Amino acid sequence: AASLPAAHPYTILGTEKVKKYAEEAVSFLQECGIRISGSAERNSWRVTPTGERKASWLTLGDFTPLTSKDEKIGSKALIVNILGYLDFNTKFLADSFEKQGTECRIVALKLEEMERLRKNPSEMRATNIARVMDRDGIWEKAAAQIKGMLKDEDTVVLPAVFGLKDQDVVEKIREAVGVKTMFVATMPPSVPGIRSQMSLKAEF
């Protein structure tokens, strides 16, 4: 706060209060059932929908924070989209990761349960995909297909379209795939964001 202009809200509050409120924010979100990582002491970096790295002091549990702007996500990455889904730009992501030295391969996940959505592009949105994935056995089917696509990749990159109602699904997919699995935010609406909003609404 000391290096900010005198009229900046952080300067007006003072360093100690800003630190106190930041710590309280973390506790509050966790008490609401929202999984987060990060510290007010330093920023981490997360991958944006366009593949850029953005500094952030808190990161939702779906996403994998990076320690630096230039950190490689892995040696070889399998970038997996949902067939027909246009709000997850795999080419942008691959270009960005390859600049950091990660070899990328792009594939598409094809599930017959998505056929109805795919017939109408306006329906092929993150929240609608997530609702389908939440049905019994669908995310498990997706995870098995992803695992079967792996060759020698050490990292899988997926759109964050899983676990609209149950954030445990995200961790279960990571376990099922069996290698480092990163979920990257899609263009809005954001499934993790909507889930967090629902958790907050449930508290008030």
Describe these PLM feature segments.
Residues 1-76, 81-88, 98-99, 103-116, ...:
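Conserved N-terminal/central alpha/beta ligand/cofactor-binding core
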Residues 88-100, 130-156, 161-204:
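Helical element adjacent to the flavin cofactor pocket in flavoenzyme catalytic cores
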Residues 110-141:
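Short, intrinsically disordered low-complexity segments
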